[in-house]
């Protein structure tokens, strides 16, 4: 059974539909130079299970590093990071768990840290 969740930025100009086939999966934090500054809890999702429903024109993309492979999306208006295309697996996105209203990201404990510092 598919479970649909809606992810929004703070100002609600960006709305993203997540098809969470098995709920929130593969929680992770990252210690790369960008992620350690923003401190978010992220979860993985297949590309086809994330759809921008509203506000595509409100999303900005930020890339960094030598290869600039990961695309980090954030709202132009409120600045909230919503999701990014995975650097290590381009068939996945990782999304900001805290952007789902009915999920409290502070309840998740012992979240593994991806060693993005090496990238």
Where are these regions (language model features)?
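A short Gly-Trp-Pro
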Residues: 1-8, 13-119
